[in-house]
A protein has these predicted regions:
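Glycine-rich phosphate-binding/catalytic subdomain of phosphoryl-transfer
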Residues: 39-42, 47-60, 64-180
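Gly/Thr-rich phosphate-binding beta-strand-loop-beta motif of the actin/hexokinase/Hsp70
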Residues: 1-29, 82-95
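Surface-exposed loop and turn segments in beta-propeller and other repeat-based domains
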Residues: 32-33
Length: 180
């Protein structure tokens, strides 16, 4: 079984491991799609180039698309012996130690930095610029390793944005998970 957590939907796929044949697949659109203007149930505007997701949409893929693809394929769940999962990197999620997303906690629900920052979140460009400036100034190897420029789409740009703009979220998060 393959599960692809995409930008607008999640897909579940069953493949016959003996033949490589695609047996069945299901596309499950995310309820909240890409969150770019306002958080769900909020009128507060998000800053430009924000791209967030709701981790509850990922759970819906697991609880709806996975059983549906098994049924569609007329497969016996006991015959599924492997699961591959993918996201586009960097998709970053602040969580508690047990993996609970911060945005699912009432205290953090209205703070955009507690939500999943999607790969195409470019609101951390200032942080990426600072990482690049410091990396170049000190001839850091990571600048060369990343093709001469660190991107706002990558983990540490998003993490630094959280540190600067939402230090309480940063302190409350016991983990920052890279989904990709």
């Amino acid at each position: 079984m393959g599960i692809d957590f995409g930008t607008l939907s999640g897909r579940a796929l069953l493949v016959n491991a003996d033949t490589g044949e695609e047996v069945a697949w299901v596309d499950h659109p995310y309820k909240n799609k890409v969150i770019e203007k306002n958080l769900p149930n909020s009128k507060k505007r998000l800053k430009p180039q924000t791209a967030l997701q709701d981790p509850a949409d990922y759970i819906a893929v697991l609880t709806k698309a996975v059983p549906k693809v098994i049924k569609l394929a007329k497969a016996n769940p006991e015959q599924i012996f492997g699961i591959g999962i993918d996201f586009t990197s960097c998709t970053m999620l602040p969580t508690l130690a047990d993996g609970t997303p911060l945005c699912s906690q009432k205290k953090w629900r209205n703070n955009p930095h507690s939500w999943v920052k999607l790969w195409k979140h470019h609101a951390a460009q200032s942080e990426a610029n600072d990482i690049n400036k410091i990396g170049l100034k000190y001839s850091e190897e990571f600048i060369t390793a990343y093709g001469g420029k660190y991107s706002s789409e990558w983990f540490f740009s998003k993490l630094l944005e959280t540190v600067r703009e939402a230090p309480k979220v940063y302190a409350a998060a016991e983990r920052f998970i890279e989904a990709g």
